[in-house]
A protein has these predicted regions:
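Viral virion structural and adsorption modules
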Residues: 1-161
Length: 161
């Protein structure tokens, strides 16, 4: 299945549609099919790849257009990439043209030591433009951690868009 992002006149992704591979033999064929079936202009259907995230891939292949397009993402025609929604990221965060994602001016989130993993967390401080290490009011117990089906969610590491 080939996937195409429908973009508006401001290059914002409205939705992602699927087209059978035998129809979308290349991007132009998929665009023509979508224009014919939806009435939306072919030039506003942009092929995307669900395996691409932060300019890398989950399956070891080559990244395609920076990120898999999501609703609200921005299509950058000059860079030929999809930018994620800035979402809750603070005003100081900028576009990283290597990862095609938003990044703090202080860089990536520092790692916690193994001893700190269940007792501390990082929070962005927009006033100082730095990561601030804080201690949980109620630390996570090892039993809670071991029982959690999603460790990243438990530790607050899931990115919210």
């Amino acid at each position: 299945m080939a996937e195409f992002a429908k973009i508006d006149e401001n290059n914002i992704v409205l939705r992602v549609d699927h087209v059978e591979d035998n129809i979308a033999t290349d991007e132009a064929a998929g665009q023509a099919h979508l224009e014919e079936t939806t009435g939306w202009p072919a030039a506003q259907w942009i092929m995307t790849d669900k395996n691409t995230h932060r300019n890398g891939t989950l399956n070891g292949g080559s990244p395609f257009r920076g990120n898999y397009a999501g609703i609200g993402y921005e299509w950058d025609p000059s860079e030929q990439v999809f930018w994620p929604i800035k979402g809750d990221n603070p005003a100081s965060w900028v576009k990283n043209t290597t990862t095609y994602d938003w990044e703090s001016p202080a860089g990536l989130l520092p790692d916690l030591t193994d001893d700190e993993l269940l007792t501390h967390y990082w929070r962005w401080d927009e006033g100082t433009l730095q990561w601030e290490k804080l201690e949980y009011a109620t630390p996570i117990t090892q039993a809670e951690y071991d029982a959690a089906p999603d460790k990243d969610e438990l530790l607050g590491r899931k990115r919210k868009y």
